[in-house]
UniProtKB/Swiss-Prot annotation:
It comes from the Eukaryota. Keywords: Cell membrane, Cell wall biogenesis/degradation, Glycosyltransferase, Membrane, Transferase, Transmembrane. This is Chitin synthase 2. Its EC number is 2.4.1.16. GO terms for molecular function: chitin synthase activity. It is a multi-pass membrane protein. GO terms for cellular component: cell septum; plasma membrane. It catalyses: [(1->4)-N-acetyl-beta-D-glucosaminyl](n) + UDP-N-acetyl-alpha-D-glucosamine = [(1->4)-N-acetyl-beta-D-glucosaminyl](n+1) + UDP + H(+). It is found in: Cell membrane. The gene is CHS2. The keyword Ribosomal protein does not apply.
Amino acid sequence: EIEFTRTMHGIMRNISHFCSRTKSRTWGKDGWQKIVVCVIADGRQNVHPRTLNALAAMGVYQDGIAKNEVNSKEVTAHVYEYTTQVSLDETLKFKGAEKGTVPCQDVFCLKEKNKKKLNSHRWFFNAFGRALTPNVCILLDVGTKPDSKALYHLWKAFDQDSNVAGAAGEIKADKGKGWMGLLNPLVAS
């Protein structure tokens, strides 16, 4: 759940940044209404229970509802929707409006079976992409912690040039507190 909350809290900090852009014609205080976060878990037996607990604490997931089959037909996936007003940071502390957190529209897709990453991407683009018709999609792996303005800068690349079809952000190693992560040769390199 640490990796998940690191990523999710980073996304929510980015949404707060979009909402702080009061002079923008696109964003502003209600900018969160233009953003939907889709979380796709690859297999009900594979997702860590503490990650589900983190999603439940945010109001996005409800335990005990998912069934293997309905009307004698196998279930492919379980979809939960919720607009949360709290975030869990990577230390598992709640952050709300008093800490600058804005609401976040979430869709959580819990796939019944592990069908791997490419299948999850198909779910995202073919199911949720068709339903939501987004202008910009940003894919993040769990554990990635976006800087507080990173998603804005990615969005801006698309906004400024309609010929842009794809963009990639810069990935930096997390150096840790007091840069202690640099003692690890993989991080230091």
